[in-house]
Amino acid sequence: MSEAIVYLASSAIIKLIFDEPETPALAEFLVEWPNRLCSTLGRVEVLRISRRVGDAVVTRHAREILTGVHLVRADEGILAAAAALEQPTLRTLDSIHLATALSLGPDLAGMVVYDRQLREAARAAGLNVWAPT
């Protein structure tokens, strides 16, 4: 197993909560990556989506999934870095995810993301990007 860190964007975490076509491949991929991180923003996104789309059981399952993900606080440095990203079409929340991932430095092996714009921005920033299917 790898000691390196993998960053999970909200789009990846959601696929662990809801049964989607990519869920089995993602779950298998993550077996090799026990060190999983996401922004605290991701927790908010995931729980809001769980409440909007699911019920109390889904929200409880989302909380269980999130216990396996270390959350990185979106501090002033990360927010400033997100605001300074060059990609003009990158949405605000996605820029925070990307800035958080970039803040991890050389310990970051890559980012798991299913959102096309964020995936392209992460690649442009030089990150390894995965979207297991």
Protein language model regions, located:
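Short, well-structured N-terminal submotif of metal-dependent ribonuclease cores
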Residues: 1-38, 51-61, 126-127, 133
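A general structural signal for well-ordered alpha-helical segments in protein cores
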Residues: 23, 43, 59-62, 79, ...
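Amphipathic alpha-helical segments within well-ordered protein domains
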Residues: 11, 47, 63-66, 83, ...
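Alpha-helix capping/helix-boundary segments
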Residues: 12-13, 42, 78, 97, ...
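Acidic catalytic patch
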Residues: 67-88, 94-100
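Short beta-strand scaffold positions
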Residues: 8, 38, 73, 92-95, ...
